[in-house]
């Protein structure tokens, strides 16, 4: 617990660089599975993590720092999965500063599949627990509104990806 920061993430300056910007957000990620060497339940697995890049940018909301982290998972036979995380760090919210309003892109026409899901506090907490994600913006309403300055809990980017994959699985049950 002594290595966890106020926001619920590991403190910066250990594995992650000592970034001076306090707000951390998921900006994207990628997964690559090695079809010839799939992970199997019960196998011993080793994870090797490296920082691939650190890039400074200035955006419409101010200073930004993008960190790309790669995690390589392997078993006795070699590499099984490569996971990349794109993390963005931002300046702290200023008192009275309104959080940006999310913009929903217009739908392009008739959707082949759809499913309405309204994430609630319990779903966000459970997904945080399932993925060992201690970032308080996903489950601590007081923290996310009073410290981070957002209007409410933040839905995990990977949860959205998981729900999209589940929609495809439900819509194409016989696809591989």
Where are these regions (language model features)?
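Catalytic strand-loop segment that frames the active site of acyl-thioester-processing enzymes
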Residues: 1, 87-155, 169
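Hydrophobic, proline/glycine-rich low-complexity stretches
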Residues: 1-44, 172
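Histidine-centered active-site/metal-ligand motif
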Residues: 22, 26, 138, 156
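N-terminal hydrophobic or amphipathic segments with adjacent small-residue motifs
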Residues: 22-23, 47, 143, 151
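HotDog/MaoC-like acyl-thioester-processing domains
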Residues: 26-119
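Catalytic-loop motifs flanking and including active-site residues across diverse enzymes
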Residues: 156-164
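A conserved acidic, glycine/proline-rich C-terminal tail/linker
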Residues: 165-176
